[in-house]
């Protein structure tokens, strides 16, 4: 990992960061149906705090008391990508303990790369006599943000968003977590939104964890196919649920001279909720 950090620092400029205050509770009253613990992530927390804030808000709007575990750690995905398996196992143990302490009904994650890693904890710790069963119980409570909302039932947003929108199926979301219908259910619930499927929406964008950092030439070749497919949809908004995809596709679209707005699913849902609230009576 130390060799990766300088490379990551080189790609910071020009990225669609949405840095703000860390999420806290909503500024409106809710009647909770569920108590959920939320993993804020590393890249998501440092570079896309607005995404996390909107995630908390949408969850609260849908009857959740949201807890952010104080002692949560990195999920361990990047460590696993570079072969630091034992460190990844240590992080898994720490997260399991931190989330268990909340007493939450569900554990929620909004970044597909983190989610795929968290859902692998039972396999990662299968031979750990102290944590194998706890890891299995952790995974049983874990849900992706979209997966959770569709499973428990959500309040459809009422604010109109007149836009042509396409959705990026992150590799770790569709192939790793098998979550692909739920984001579309949520998007189709937004009034005025036209969802246009891109060709090969589940093809890798070239981010692939840290692949675009350690193998930028090959990653950019993969990215060129994604840029073409996004462009062909004529969408003005792309929705993605992984920070790596957001960063990579934003880079490709800007380089191609075809910038477009890239939003997380939580952001576009929260936008619709707020538009309805702000509409004149």
Briefly describe each language-model feature range:
Residues 1-281:
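Iron-sulfur cluster-binding electron-transfer modules in prokaryotic oxidoreductases
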């Amino acid at each position: 990992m130390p060799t990766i950090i300088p490379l990551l620092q080189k790609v910071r400029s020009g990225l669609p960061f949405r840095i703000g205050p860390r999420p806290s509770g909503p500024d409106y009253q809710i009647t909770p149906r569920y108590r959920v613990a939320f993993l804020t992530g590393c890249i998501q927390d440092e570079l896309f705090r607005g995404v996390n804030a909107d995630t908390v808000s949408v969850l609260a709007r849908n009857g959740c008391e949201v807890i952010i575990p104080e002692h949560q750690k990195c999920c361990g995905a990047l460590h696993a990508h570079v072969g630091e398996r034992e460190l990844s196992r240590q992080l898994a143990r720490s997260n399991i303990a931190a989330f268990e302490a909340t007493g939450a009904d569900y554990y929620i994650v909004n970044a597909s790369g983190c989610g795929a890693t968290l859902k692998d904890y039972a396999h990662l710790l299968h031979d750990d006599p102290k944590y194998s069963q706890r890891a299995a119980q952790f995974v049983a409570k874990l849900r992706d943000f979209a997966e959770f909302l569709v499973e428990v039932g959500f309040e459809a947003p009422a604010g109109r968003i007149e836009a042509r929108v396409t959705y990026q199926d992150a590799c770790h979301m569709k192939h790793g977590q098998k979550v692909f219908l739920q984001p579309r259910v949520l998007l189709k619930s937004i009034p005025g939104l036209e969802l246009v499927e891109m060709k090969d929406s589940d093809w890798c964008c070239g981010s692939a964890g840290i692949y675009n950092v350690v193998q930028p030439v090959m990653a950019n070749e993969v990215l060129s196919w994604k840029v073409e497919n996004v462009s062909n949809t004529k969408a003005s908004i792309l929705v993605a649920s992984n920070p790596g995809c957001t960063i990579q596709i934003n880079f490709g679209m800007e380089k191609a001279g075809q910038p477009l707005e890239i939003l997380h699913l939580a952001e576009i849902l929260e936008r619709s909720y707020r538009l309805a609230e702000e509409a004149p009576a």
